[in-house]
């Protein structure tokens, strides 16, 4: 790892569109669904910017949303129908970009929220994409490999009307892999009559994938942690850390922290966690995970995911799903730095509590932006058929995240607010500027 590794916002003619569905009758920040949660965050930033009501209305809802039925023939020869979604929040700054997740808890509101967050994430790191997200309501663990392939290909065919390297570019997300991306690329290419490598990122390297994409989210998160620690005068060597979630992002963050001399004392996955005050060894955890399917098979004191969040550590990395830190447990979070490798792991009420307790929260739209940053690099490489060495990818990623952190910190300082609100102010301001410059058609 190379390190040790306003524009002024003029008012415009109000832009009116149909209002989104109303929030629940009793809606506190803690019980909002993900989409209302995302809009609440957006509105806080919009208030700081004094955003024009028309622009606010436009950016608070998706540009396009597609719900599809996905019939596939199961291995037992019976037909089963799944529900899938693809939401494009904004294309003001370029093609829409965002992952596809296969999970039994996927809902339209969740996908809409994730698409909005992708818009802000791309704007924070200043890459020329808008935000999108996709998902299928399914438990992929209950599908065979052949069923996974048929589901992926049929889903791709259903949403292909809005895909394209210059329109909407998917990527891996929860329970989707480079193999799923290969199936998407191939299916879309068959409808075009030629290979279109740039229609999707996160692909296997032989199909136009980028070096460094697999660990990009974690590497970006680690660089953001470095920046936060530097500003707090917290040496990473000897610092303690806990990582909730040991998938792609969480496992690599743990690895990079260990390499920097930090002591990773706890990790967890969906089955629970382990704790060792003297520090866990990354190689032993991954070996246990590969052999038994869970980190709890490694040696260490068994703890729950909830207990992990409340450990007395310097750095906490929530790298699982949304809503891990809430008003119920936020006051018991003892970490000095919370680096959100997951999307939306901290609720608005919890954010307020952490802020009042002096915890530095590196928001998801900055902390986990490494993935989409290297996806952008992959897209560029595919368009030009010119592929970069791993060190080139790593250096560009590190430079991008450090510059983004500086931009966010400066915006937060200027507005006398926290990093999350600073990141949103920065991102919303950039999207507002391009929206205003483009104007309205017709």
What are these regions (language model features)?
Residues 103, 123-237:
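Glycine/serine-rich phosphate-binding loop and adjoining beta1-alpha1 elements at the start
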Residues 204, 209-313:
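Glycine-rich phosphate/diphosphate-binding loop of Rossmann-like nucleotide-binding domains
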Residues 26-69:
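Short, Gly/Pro- and small/polar-rich lid/capping loops
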Residues 68-140:
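Glycine-rich, N-terminal phosphate-binding loop and its surrounding beta-alpha-beta segment
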Residues 26-32, 228-229, 331-442:
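Adenosine-phosphate binding glycine-rich loop
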Residues 272-361:
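Rossmann-like adenosine-cofactor binding region
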């Amino acid at each position: 790892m190379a390190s040790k590794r306003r524009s002024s916002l003029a008012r415009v003619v109000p832009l009116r569109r149909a209002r989104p569905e109303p929030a629940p009758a009793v809606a506190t920040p803690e019980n909002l669904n993900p989409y209302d949660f995302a809009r609440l965050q957006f509105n806080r930033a919009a208030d700081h910017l004094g955003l024009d009501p028309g622009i606010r209305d436009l950016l608070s809802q998706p540009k396009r949303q597609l719900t599809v039925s996905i019939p596939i023939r199961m291995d037992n020869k019976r037909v089963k129908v799944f529900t899938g979604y693809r939401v494009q929040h904004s294309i003001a700054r370029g093609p829409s970009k965002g992952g596809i997740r296969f999970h039994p808890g996927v809902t339209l509101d969740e996908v809409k929220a994730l698409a909005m967050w992708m818009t802000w994430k791309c704007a924070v790191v200043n890459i020329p994409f808008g935000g999108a997200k996709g998902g299928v309501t399914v438990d992929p663990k209950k599908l065979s490999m052949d069923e996974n392939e048929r589901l992926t290909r049929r889903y791709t065919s259903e949403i292909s009307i809005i895909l394209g390297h210059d329109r909407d570019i998917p990527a891996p997300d929860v329970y989707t892999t480079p193999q799923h991306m290969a199936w998407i690329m191939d299916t879309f290419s068959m409808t075009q009559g030629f290979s279109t490598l740039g229609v999707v990122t996160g692909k296997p390297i032989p199909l136009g994938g980028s070096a460094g994409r697999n660990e990009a989210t974690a590497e970006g998160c680690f660089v953001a942690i470095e920046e936060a620690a530097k500003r707090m005068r917290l040496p990473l060597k000897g610092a303690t850390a806990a990582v909730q979630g040991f998938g792609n992002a969480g496992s690599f963050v743990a690895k990079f922290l260990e390499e920097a001399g930090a002591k990773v004392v706890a990790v967890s996955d969906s089955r629970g966690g382990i704790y060792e005050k003297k520090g866990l060894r990354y190689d032993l955890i991954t070996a246990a995970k590969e052999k038994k399917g869970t980190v709890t098979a490694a040696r260490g004191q068994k703890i729950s995911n909830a207990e992990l969040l409340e450990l007395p550590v310097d750095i906490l990395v929530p790298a699982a799903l949304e809503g891990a830190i809430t008003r119920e447990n936020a006051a018991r979070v003892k970490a000095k730095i919370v680096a959100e490798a997951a999307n939306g792991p901290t609720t608005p009420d919890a954010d307020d509590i952490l802020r009042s307790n002096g915890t530095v929260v590196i928001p998801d739209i900055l902390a986990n932006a490494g993935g989409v940053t290297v996806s952008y690099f992959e897209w560029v490489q595919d368009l030009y058929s010119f592929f970069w060495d791993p060190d080139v990818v790593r250096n560009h990623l590190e430079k991008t995240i450090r510059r983004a952190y500086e931009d966010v910190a400066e915006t937060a300082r200027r507005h006398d607010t926290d990093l999350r609100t600073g990141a949103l102010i920065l991102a919303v301001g950039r999207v507002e500027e391009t929206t205003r410059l483009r104007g309205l058609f017709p």
